[in-house]
Every structure is written in C-alpha cells, then in structure tokens.
C-alpha cells in the first residue's frame, strides 16, 4: 500500500482540522486509507499528513468527493491547496 506525504492550508487551526480528520477515519478506512500521523506548522496555517492510501490517486478520488470536500472546507481546509509532496518509500517513527 502506498504512503503519501500531503500538505494543505488551514484557517481554523489544527484542533478543528484534527476533529474533522478523526470524523473521516471510518469513511477513509472503508476505502483503504489511514492517517499515520499529522502535524502543523507553528502558526497552524498548514497541515502535513502522512497517509496509507490504496493508490496514489486517492487524494483526487476521495479527497474531492463532494461530502468529503464539504467537511474539509467547513473545518477550514483550503481544498484547492492540497498538495502531494511525495510518495513515501519507507519511514521510521522513532522509539
């Protein structure tokens, strides 16, 4: 399963974004995706997310679904700013 490192601009802070992301876990999981970790920059205007996804196109096929897009926008995500930084080959989360 591919992993992606993705970023998106946010306007309502990290807590609001994470609440939305948690509410999407079941929907995303039913399509084979899972957030591995998420972090924000110091001023909470961008989120960086590492995800397991069923295929590299997942951000387009799932992330732009009308119901998902609406939830993301309501949580302050600038959906049009969503950018796949890179596909991840291997990673280490530390001890």
Give residue ranges: language-model regions.
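Short S/T/G/P-rich N-terminal loop/turn motif that feeds into the first structured element of a domain
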Residues: 1-69, 74-95
């Amino acid at each position: 399963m591919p992993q992606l490192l993705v970023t998106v601009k946010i306007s309502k802070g990290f807590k609001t974004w994470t609440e939305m992301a948690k509410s999407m876990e079941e929907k995303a999981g039913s399509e084979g995706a899972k957030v591995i970790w998420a972090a924000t920059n110091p001023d909470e205007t961008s989120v960086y997310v590492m995800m397991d996804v069923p295929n590299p196109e997942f951000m387009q096929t799932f992330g732009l679904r009308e119901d998902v897009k609406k939830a993301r926008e309501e949580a302050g995500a600038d959906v049009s700013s969503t950018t796949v930084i890179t596909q991840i080959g291997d990673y280490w989360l530390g001890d």
